[in-house]
Amino acid sequence: MNNIQKSRNNRIIAKTAHKSDIIIGAAIGYSDDQIKPFILSLKSSGYKGRLVLFVDKLDSGAVSFLIEQEIELIWQISHRDNAMPVYGHRYYEFLDFLRKEQGVKRIMLTDVRDVIFQGNPFVGCGDESLYVFSEDSSVKLGQCPYNSEWVLNLYGNDILKKISGEIIICSGVTIGGYHNILGYLDLLCNEMSINPQIPIADQGAHNVLIGFQVSLSSTTNQGQYTLFTMSAQTGSELIEMEDSLSMMEADRL
């Protein structure tokens, strides 16, 4: 039995993991090089909770690396007969999974390929709040052609006009208490169901929900934080990050 077969048949929960904190992401079609920055920076952050990845179409190197790192793998995200793109459908999978979990107090929903950690992401986060994270505050949503298009496609021009002056909130990372995250996911999935085939519907729905949904009491972080989303970095900045991660990996060997 190879590593891929083993990983499909077993859920590994690290024996030292604190069960009350959980980080959830999706990794579809990634190589080990695409996953390592996320995993290695998290391992070096001091985080002691669970990490669950919904995965499929990983190469053998990525599977071997994730098994070695004792990551919980769930092989199902792209197996359902669903027309919604995987980056939207993952939230339905997350919601189904979390509804069955017990003893969870704090949750982080996150992208994988473009996120690195600079510390424990839950430091300073309570278990009765919802935390969202802005992109460059100098660029408003209406000034970004991509975010404008995602909102326009899902909601139309009237909603886009109302939200165009707001800062852009990144849907790639959301942190909160168990009930706060479940409430957020319920609302997000309902919004994306308006038109399930729209690309990047999660980003458009996320910004509208945070901007207008009264029941979502959220805290927006615009300053330095313990994680970093690589959305629009220069080549020199990425080279510096790559060098730091290479040293991080060498230290673990």
Task: Give residue ranges: language-model regions.
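Short, flexible, basic/aromatic active-site loop/helix in glycosyltransferases
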Residues: 148-165
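GT-A fold catalytic core of metal-dependent nucleotide-sugar glycosyltransferases
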Residues: 93-146
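A structural signal for short, well-ordered beta-strand segments and their strand-loop junctions
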Residues: 52-54, 106-111, 131-133, 175, ...
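Catalytic core and acceptor-binding pocket of nucleotide-sugar-dependent glycosyltransferases
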Residues: 162-253
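Short catalytic/ligand-binding loop motif for oxyanion handling, primarily in non-cytosolic enzymes
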Residues: 61-63, 115-119, 124-125, 139-142, ...
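N-terminal anchoring/stem segment of glycosyltransferases
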Residues: 1-89, 96-104, 179
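Active-site donor-binding segments of glycosyltransferases and PAPS-dependent sulfotransferases
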Residues: 70-91, 234-252
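Generic preference for well-ordered alpha-helical elements
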Residues: 32-35, 91, 114, 171, ...
